[in-house]
């Protein structure tokens, strides 16, 4: 990877792509630059192609539901692999293994289908070239604490104050518009970059920003730290 280009695909995402590019450039010792505007990700800028990426049924793989209308209600979920096809068109011919790594930041909820449990899961990062980073998926993908879910269920069952439960646990997980989102996205961007450099995005060390955190606590303690473990720090040093 000679260069990293960070694209703002959605102005509402609230991520400073210039700051993100600068972080990646410093961390990896490569040239990095931002591209703002995001026209390629808005429905009016995608020629209707964006709507064709929307998931109609979270319990079926995309190829079995292609062309079906999404069910009414709920948050729109988009297939990550289909979005990558759009991203490739936005990024241009330089988005190749021998060219620049293009990192696309969006606030769309992005997911991929998992054959292991036959359903879609929200993915904060879909590592490829281009790679996708989703702020919405960083909120809704990693699980919140068991205590939070228990208290939220109890509040619903009793007609209690769900807002009070949210407030009590606000520090434990990311929410939309969270000031900690920029740090989390930096960690996910490092995962995308590591995949481009080595073919492996994740780390088993739960203190490393490359850790594949399935819980919000791990996102905040590891991914958002921006810190590499000793092994990956050395690996980056040897690659750049």
Task: Kindly give the residue locations of the regions a language model identified.
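Zn2+-dependent metallopeptidase catalytic core
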Residues: 13-34
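Short hydrophobic beta-strand segments
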Residues: 1-14, 103
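Metzincin-family zinc-dependent endopeptidase catalytic domain
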Residues: 38-204, 212-213
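Conserved beta-strand termini and adjacent loop/short-helix elements that scaffold enzyme active sites
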Residues: 9, 35-38
């Amino acid at each position: 990877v000679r260069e990293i280009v960070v694209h703002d695909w959605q102005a509402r995402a609230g991520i400073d792509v210039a700051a993100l590019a600068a972080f990646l450039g410093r961390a990896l010792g490569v040239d990095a630059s931002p591209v703002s505007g995001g026209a390629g990700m808005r429905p009016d800028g995608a020629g209707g192609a964006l709507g064709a990426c929307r998931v109609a049924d979270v319990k079926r793989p995309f190829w079995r539901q292609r062309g079906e209308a999404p069910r009414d209600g709920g948050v729109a979920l988009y297939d990550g692999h289909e979005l990558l096809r759009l991203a490739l068109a936005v990024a241009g011919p330089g988005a190749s293994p021998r060219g620049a790594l293009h990192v696309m930041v969006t606030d769309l909820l992005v997911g991929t289908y998992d054959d292991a449990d036959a359903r879609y899961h929200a993915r904060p990062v879909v590592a490829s070239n281009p790679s996708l980073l989703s702020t919405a998926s960083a909120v809704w993908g990693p699980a919140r604490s068991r205590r939070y879910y228990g208290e939220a269920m109890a509040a619903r069952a009793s007609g209690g104050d769900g807002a009070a439960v949210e407030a009590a646990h606000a520090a434990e997980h990311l929410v939309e518009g969270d000031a900690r989102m920029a740090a989390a996205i930096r960690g996910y961007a490092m995962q995308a970059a590591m995949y481009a450099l080595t073919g492996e995005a994740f780390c088993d060390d739960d203190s490393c920003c490359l850790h594949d955190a399935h819980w919000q606590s791990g996102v905040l303690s590891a991914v958002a730290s921006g810190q590499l473990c000793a092994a990956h720090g050395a690996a980056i040093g040897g690659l750049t």
